[in-house]
Each structure stands twice: as C-alpha cells, then as structure tokens.
C-alpha cells in the first residue's frame, strides 16, 4: 500500500513538472538552441561513437553526447523536440531527487514539493538552458549535490550515488573534482564513516 501511494505521488509530481516545463518551453520546443546543440548533433551524425569522448568543448561532455547519438536516430525534423524532451526529463529527475531527499530530511511533503519546484522553475534562458541537451550537466550537478548531502540516500543507494558521480564527472568540467573523493569514500573499506561526504560536497 505504501509503495503504491509513493508511486502515485512521484507520478503526480512528474506530471506536474512536465506540464510546467512544457509551458516554459512554449515557442522554443521546436527550435534547436544555438548554444552547443548544432555542433553536438553534427558530431553525432558525422562521427558516431568516437565523438562521445570528444574534447571539442575543452572538456568531456559524455552524457549530452550519448543523448545526441540517440536523438539523431530519429528524422532530422524531430531533433529539436527530442532534444527538449530529453532535457526536460533530467529537470524532472532533478526535481524528484530534491523532493525525495528533502522529504527524508524535513519530513514535510509541502516543503519538499516547494523545494523541488524551485529546481523545476529556476530562472533560465528559455532556449539556451531548458531545451539544450548540452546543459544537462547542471541537472546532474544538482542531483549529485543533493543526493550526496542526504544521509538516507547515501546509505540506501550508495552504488547509485557512485554511478551518478561518475556520469556527472564525465559530463561536467567541474564535477570531476567531486567525483574522485566520492568514489574513493565508498571504495575505501577502512574509512571510519562511509556516510561522511563533507569533503566531496565541499568540492561540489
């Protein structure tokens, strides 16, 4: 019963975030943002797989490039809408992560929803940020920082946190600083406190 209630809670929140994001993307959902999108899709089409680990931007951006490889499978006229959809998906995941972690910490679903809405409704340039897969690194950064600061998430989903840290580290030029200590924190069996993430979170 509790599982079903939680399932419907997260499904309802995801639906709410989706409506808000579609409203925010109005007028831009069918257009590619000029910030990074042109090059990343061209690389995916012209240099499949090898461009995933490209340093063309001066740093690794693995997840956006993997997403670009998936998007270019569809006809080119759908590139913009799929790009916006993928980016919105990560805003939704960031919002749900904030809700989950805040709920475990404060115990209030009202404050938790408010905190998650702050993430989904964060002011941003509509075309440059909301529908730009090149900027999903920021959603990942939010997920890593919030999940890593939640003792409950760390203890219950430690392997998932390592995966998030690795993906973020390979997709964000700054997050690699935090990724290394987070991974070592969990791999070091002799560490006195496996849940002590003050150092890596300070790096974040």
Task: Outline where the language-model segments fall.
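Helix-to-loop transition at the C-terminal end of transmembrane segments
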Residues: 19-38
């Amino acid at each position: 019963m509790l599982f079903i209630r939680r399932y419907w809670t997260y499904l309802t929140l995801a639906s709410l975030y989706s409506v808000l994001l579609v409203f925010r993307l109005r007028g831009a959902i069918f257009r590619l943002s000029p910030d990074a999108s042109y090059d990343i899709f061209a690389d995916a089409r012209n240099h499949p797989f090898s461009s995933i680990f490209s340093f063309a931007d001066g740093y690794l951006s693995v997840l956006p490039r993997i997403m670009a490889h998936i998007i270019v499978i569809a006809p080119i006229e759908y590139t913009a809408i799929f790009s916006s959809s993928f980016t919105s998906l990560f805003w939704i995941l960031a919002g749900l992560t904030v809700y989950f972690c805040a709920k475990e910490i404060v115990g209030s679903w009202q404050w938790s929803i408010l905190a998650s809405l702050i993430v989904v409704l964060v002011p941003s340039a509509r075309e440059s940020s909301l529908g730009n897969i090149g900027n999903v690194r920021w959603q990942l950064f939010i997920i890593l920082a919030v999940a890593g600061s939640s003792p409950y998430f760390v203890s219950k989903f430690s392997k998932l946190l390592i995966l998030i840290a690795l993906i973020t580290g390979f997709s964000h030029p700054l997050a690699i600083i935090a990724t290394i200590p987070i991974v070592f924190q969990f791999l070091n069996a002799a560490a006195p406190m496996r849940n002590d993430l003050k150092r890596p979170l300070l790096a974040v």
